[in-house]
Amino acid sequence: MTDGSARPTRRRITVLGSTGSIGTSTVDLLARIPDEIEVRALVGGCNAALLAEQARRLNAEVAVIHDESRHEELKTCLAGTGIRTAAGRQAVIEAGAMEADWTMAAITGAAGLEPTLAAARNGHAVALANKEALVCAGDVMLRAVAEAGATLLPVDSEHNAIAQSLGGCDMESVEKIILTASGGPFRKSSIEEMRAATPEKALKHPTWTMGAKITIDSASMANKGLEVIEAARLFGLTEDRIDVLVHPQSVVHGLVQFRDGSLVSQMGSADMRIPIAHTLAWPKRMVTPCERLDLAAYGRLEFEAPDEVRFAPLRLARQVLRAGGAAPAVFSAANEVAVDAFLNRRIGFLGIGETIDAALQAMDENPELRTLDDVLHWDARGRALAEAHILRQSGGLRNDVSENALNA
């Protein structure tokens, strides 16, 4: 006989990328269920003050900051709290490897690959918000998940919507899936207007509030391209079974077309706490403060096909998904370099797609990526190819020396 007064076991939680946009939304939800959780680790990038505030709020066991130059500031902020601190790349990986029942993997870019893999190898639930883990290292990640018996829970609103819309049905019943896109700030812009677009204009997303990198990705539709590749990995689908629809209201987040003709969708307000809460409470549901959707207030929902001429990254993403091998890793790496260059006014907005295309065209081979070292090698290679293109465009690198620069 069990004691009815016994308290349920607290779930052990780790948040990788707690100071980013997904991470802060996650912390907000965790702070609402303090009696149900035990926060093992919070990992941030360079914002020591925010990381310390989060660690105190959640009474975390350890706070880890990637930027080693901010470690002293973090220690000062947490002095006398009993919360341990650590810093640097290896400390971030070790935080990912800590035994936890649920890990939020929200470190963006290639920097998130190693800690996300470490979390998957624990064999528990990983809420995946790091696109690169599946885009660049899909085979490596899925193999680690399978070998450890882990559960991969998609956080991206579109993939989470697909998972909810499937409702437990097997993929043989699925004809295709449809990912939605807001269209970003340039949905109605001409090529000439997009060519002249500034970072300030590109950062004004019409419906979502996100970090700078993902906001620019949304504006270029590189984000949707990455999501097409990620969806193929997550759901085991070929490129021709993944459609994209532009839906400016951002109310419908994803749809599943079943072979019997049924079309099932997931809808909700544009608040990332909704998909995060779904992964946190899965297979149950939790109460959230998110705004409830009032469909009558919208009156009308719009859908249109994306323009893959103006939004070249989406077209290129489909090409690399069909090509396989190292191409997706090069696409992702080149996009990161291009977005950074655009934000720093080194290239124009359309230069993002041009840089990705140039990096892909410059690949002299396209091998399968079987290990993390393979992935990291081609990530670095993609960055070098992209940077070489940007330098050539600005007159800073001659064609005859570019290969030496890439192989340095």
Curated annotation (Swiss-Prot):
Q: Which cofactor does it need?
A: Mg(2+); Mn(2+)
Listed InterPro entries:
DXP_reductoisomerase (IPR003821), DXP_reductoisomerase_C (IPR013644), DXP_reductoisomerase_N (IPR013512), DXPR_C (IPR026877), DXPR_C_sf (IPR036169), NAD(P)-bd_dom_sf (IPR036291)
Does the UniProt entry include the keyword Chaperone? no
Residues at which Mn(2+) binds: 156, 158, 227
The pathway that the record names for this protein is: Isoprenoid biosynthesis; isopentenyl diphosphate biosynthesis via DXP pathway; isopentenyl diphosphate from 1-deoxy-D-xylulose 5-phosphate: step 1/6
User: Which keywords appear in this protein's UniProt record, sorted alphabetically?
Assistant: Isoprene biosynthesis, Manganese, Metal-binding, NADP, Oxidoreductase
* E.C. number: 1.1.1.267
Q: By its UniProt entry, which Pfam families does this protein fall under? A: DXP_redisom_C (PF08436), DXP_reductoisom (PF02670), DXPR_C (PF13288)
Q: Which GO terms describe its biological process?
A: isopentenyl diphosphate biosynthetic process, methylerythritol 4-phosphate pathway involved in terpenoid biosynthetic process
Task: Output the HAMAP family linked to this UniProt entry.
Answer: DXP_reductoisom
Functionally, this protein is described as follows: Catalyzes the NADPH-dependent rearrangement and reduction of 1-deoxy-D-xylulose-5-phosphate (DXP) to 2-C-methyl-D-erythritol 4-phosphate (MEP).
UniProt xrefs under NCBIfam families = Dxr
Q: Which family does it belong to?
A: Belongs to the DXR family.
Q: What is this protein called?
A: 1-deoxy-D-xylulose 5-phosphate reductoisomerase
Which species is the source of this protein?
Gluconobacter oxydans (strain 621H) (Gluconobacter suboxydans)
